[in-house]
Amino acid sequence: MMQGLFFEGKHEQQCVFDRYYRTNPFQGGYTVVAGLEHLIDYVHNIHFSEDDLAYLKSTGFFQDEFLEYLKDLRFTGDIYAMPEGTVAFPQEVLLRVQTKKDEALLLETCMSMIMNHESLIATKARRVRTVAGKDNLMEFGLRRAQGKSAGVYGARSAMIGGFNGTSNVLAGAKFGMPVLGTMAHSWIMSFSSELEAFRAYARQYPNNLILLADTYNTLKQGVPDAITIFKEMKAAGTLPKAYGIRLDSGDLAYLSKEAHKMFVEAGFPDAIIAASNDLDENLISELKAQGCVINSWGVGTNLITAKDSPSLGGVFKLVGQYDDGKFVPKIKMSDNVEKISNPGLKNVLRIYDKETGKMKADIIILEGESIDESKDLLLQSDKAPWRSRTIPGGTYRVQKMLIPIFQKGELVYQKPDLKEIMAYADQQIQTLWPEYLRLVNPEEMWVQRSTKLSALRDKVLKEESAHFF
């Protein structure tokens, strides 16, 4: 497409593309935006190397004149986006690109891959955090991840979603994340007995004393052997503040309760009981409902692969272009009504209740529109007009959600560190009422188009429809 536009003389036409999605993953009530830092690095460094150009030439698809043009191609436009950790909803503009058309097309695939994947994992992680409460959450997914990049960036996304650390050492090094983990069954099987394996581990890692208790028999051997080690270390004055076991199989609710009883009777009521074994938010919720005594969770496969919703349907659509210096809104029509796009240069205004700090609604606007917080605000529903309601002036505040990231090809955004992103993500979740956080049948956030945007959409739809009727 880029080459075709080049020879048609349209490659440098200024245009606007929006990135958004249509449906929340996991049948949930929200999506956590992630991947912006990864995207920034990609955009900032995008270029064609000599090897890239040589390969493109070898395919036989590309002409020399176009390949010569690609040598100096860099991103020269503007990007606006919601910051990482932002809670978002269907149809909202998550990211807006204003640039030459060939540059936008060059960004589309990688941009979609990065933000679809990382937002998906961050959202899954946040659902796990919601049910885990204040428990420790460890990301254990690398061995089941669909590739190195998915494992590394998935681990970072899990942190944005609320996890405490990862077993992925590369991710820890790359992003400054806490590296957490325990032993494997192979460690225990490498020694003459489980007790000797535990003793050896305690010698080597006295401050990381989480012993894997289910290699042979959890309650008859694993837990008693762990208690023996704890007693030996206590007598020697070397028992760390944090110590305990991990369960990786069996009835986790029953085993954790029985193990806890044994620890209490032995004088170790504070022993940590960690659990793993194909966990996700649904299973953790069930285990807690059954009274499990688990306060640390290793979540791997179902998180890193987003098993029950393995893709986020984010799209990147042309919403306007400049023809002879005049901005012309564009719309994608479809036989599926939900796939009809919103034309024009847009932003999102978020409405918060001043008293509670909770989110009340999002309004998709045309860029330049504003809301007077002192005046009553009418929320109108296209689907259910009888649900329309008014928010009294003075009781709400408004926040514009898209902020500048690149301007004229230059990075103008000060990238926050991961801890800052995590704190912001936590704050965002706190603005949602619990009804929006439910795992099953969550409340749907109120999202509407502004009156001006609705009018523009209707106008462009009518103009485009005239070609067919």
Language-model features: locations:
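Ordered alpha/beta subdomains of enzyme catalytic regions
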Residues: 1-207, 234-235, 317-469
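Glycine-rich phosphate/ribose-binding loops and adjacent secondary-structure elements
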Residues: 186-364
